[in-house]
A protein has these predicted regions:
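Asp-based, Mg2+/Mn2+-dependent phosphohydrolase catalytic module
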Residues: 75, 83-117
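Conserved acidic, metal-coordinating active-site core of Asp-based
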Residues: 1-75, 84
Length: 117
């Protein structure tokens, strides 16, 4: 098992993790979170991919909208918060693009000439 999703609140995290070893909670909503192995969040995954391909942090872009995306946004050179992201994510991002519903990733990539249409 790599990940378990649970409906819970922050006040319940300690109780949920009681009796577990080498696990952490990464929340993506006020009432939901993922239980994952310790040191296996999105930021660590991004760092592993960058190291594998010999890329620098500045060569990477990440998009996110939930609390569980914050460490990923901080692990790359340009962290982009979706327009529908929670305020905490927007505050930690370098840039804010349009919402998911407005195809924010597509429009950001088009504006930055990362893709052509």
């Amino acid at each position: 098992i790599y990940q378990i999703m649970c409906a819970c609140r922050k006040e319940e995290y300690a109780q949920i993790l009681q009796g577990t070893e080498n696990t952490q909670i990464t929340a993506w909503w006020d009432k939901a979170a993922d239980i994952i192995p310790l040191n296996c969040g999105k930021g660590n995954a991004v760092n592993a991919v960058l190291n594998y391909y010999g890329l620098s942090k500045d060569e990477a872009i990440a998009f996110g909208d939930g609390r569980n995306d914050i460490e990923m946004l901080e692990a790359v050179g340009t962290g982009v918060a979706m327009g529908n992201a929670i305020d905490e994510v927007k505050a930690r991002a370098d840039v804010i693009c349009k919402s998911v519903e407005e195809d924010g990733v597509y429009h950001y990539c088009l504006e930055k000439k990362l893709i052509q249409c």
